[in-house]
Amino acid sequence: MSGKNEIINEKEAVMVQTPVLTLTKPTVEDGAAMWQLAKSSSLDTNSSYKYIMMCEYFDDTCIVAKDGDEVVGFITAFIPPKQQDTLFIWQIGVAASQRGRGLGLDLINKLIEREACKDIRYVEATVTPSNKASQALFRKLARSHQTDCQVSSCFSEQLFPGDSHEQENTFRIGPLRS
């Protein structure tokens, strides 16, 4: 080599193949990885028990994205007993390596296609005013389903102990199906 920088033209470039992710129901074994992913992000971190419990008792309404055996994304969600037509999304976690690729939207869409969600007409989540990424995701979900996204006040900051939690606003997307 002559010491000069070599320029490789596009014809000589090596194709980089992005891995295909598997979107599936979580198992209790996935709970710890979901907790770790939440802990390594800006999400509110719940106890590891919460993630394991969601995998055990709410697996029909939760989903994980895996790259091989590694959990790189998840949603914890449930159907509120008094709102059987609504899927409430508690958390969406996406690994830094997967952000900006539409994984959050893919996870939601795959989740609402499940048999357990066949009667779901609305998706709800609470989002803080500073969480612009989640706000954009839920608005994009509404646009992709050509439906409404209504935002209303839910939990004021006065309800939270301490002084470091913003208010939570409800994002309600739907109706999803006629």
UniProtKB/Swiss-Prot annotation:
GO terms for molecular function: diaminobutyrate acetyltransferase activity. GO terms for biological process: ectoine biosynthetic process. It comes from the Bacteria. Gene3D superfamilies: 3.40.630.30. It holds the Pfam family Acetyltransf_1. Residues 21-174 form the N-acetyltransferase domain. Pathway: Amine and polyamine biosynthesis; ectoine biosynthesis; L-ectoine from L-aspartate 4-semialdehyde: step 2/3. Keywords: Acyltransferase, Transferase. It is an enzyme of class 2 (transferase). SUPFAM superfamilies: Acyl-CoA N-acyltransferases (Nat) (SSF55729). Its EC number is 2.3.1.178. PANTHER family: N-ACETYLTRANSFERASE, UPF0039 PROTEIN C11D3.02C. Belongs to the acetyltransferase family. EctA subfamily. This is L-2,4-diaminobutyric acid acetyltransferase. It comes from Shouchella clausii (strain KSM-K16) (Alkalihalobacillus clausii). The lineage of its organism: Bacteria, Bacillati, Bacillota, Bacilli, Bacillales.
